[in-house]
Design a protein with these regions (language model features):
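ER/Golgi luminal nucleotide-sugar-dependent glycosyltransferases, focusing on the catalytic module
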Residues: 1-242
Length: 242
């Protein structure tokens, strides 16, 4: 039976400094653990898939045990991204590689299922409310649904229309058909993944989140909090897993 509402966390714990303001692997690992702990402890998510394309040197067995103790399943997928294109095209291409690997290798992301994709090192404070509101929806994004007026459409730093890729909901079938290969047409300089998703979503039915997701964590490119940062208690608990 296909699983519904799996959480897919895309991750890059070891990342080139040129791509991110937060590039130190130890800091990125701590932030990843902060996110995992909150997802495991504080939401109704039953299955979490963490997929990292940088093959970090870390033993995830303790956090997997923590998940089991809370009645959750944590699947960890680690691989090494193909760096030839990743290094020239940027993190958009790398993000796409991670998602493609997860869809192709996870035991929980199967046809007929649905998942919430979240950027690694982040947590959605109001996730359970969002999950309830969108239980019957197959594709939900922060922009750009067709009902949006142009003035409401999210834009990137260069003013290009885009969707947020930090957090969205997708059916596995929907994603495989419409977005799985979007990354091959991306380049951080001229066409980041947020803009490529925008173009592709214009052609297919989808909806917007009924309430704004409250994102906890720090933007890796800017080293600034989203809506809030993890608390000192979150960070202290995460360090016990290091």
């Amino acid at each position: 039976m296909a699983e519904k509402d799996v959480l897919l966390m895309g991750s890059a714990i070891r990342t080139p400094k040129a791509f991110q303001a937060i590039s130190a692997a130890d800091i990125r690992l701590e932030q990843t653990l902060c996110g995992l702990i909150r997802w495991i402890r504080d939401t109704s998510v039953g299955t979490i898939v963490l997929c990292d394309g940088t093959r970090p040197d870390y033993d995830f067995s303790r956090i997997e045990t923590f998940a089991k103790e809370h009645g959750k399943t944590l699947e960890v997928l680690l691989f090494e991204k193909k760096n030839d294109q990743y290094e020239t095209r940027g993190k958009s291409y790398g993000e796409g590689q991670v998602l493609e690997y997860a869809i192709g290798h996870s035991a929980h992301l199967k046809p007929g299922g649905t998942f919430y994709k979240v950027t690694g090192r982040t947590f959605i404070e109001n996730f359970d409310a969002i999950k309830t509101l969108h239980a019957k929806d197959d594709a939900v994004f922060i922009g750009p649904a067709s009902v949006m007026m142009p003035k409401d459409t999210p834009k990137d730093v260069f003013g290009r229309r885009s969707v947020w890729t930090q957090f969205y909901k997708c059916g596995v079938d929907f994603f495989s058909k419409h977005l799985l290969k979007a990354y091959v047409d991306t380049n951080d300089t001229t066409n980041p993944i947020e803009c490529e998703y925008f173009k592709r979503l214009q052609r297919v039915p989808h909806t917007r989140f009924a309430i704004k997701p409250f994102i906890v964590g720090r933007n890796g490119g800017l080293d600034l909090p989203y809506d809030a940062d993890f608390t000192e208690n979150d960070k202290a608990l995460a360090r016990t897993f290091l």
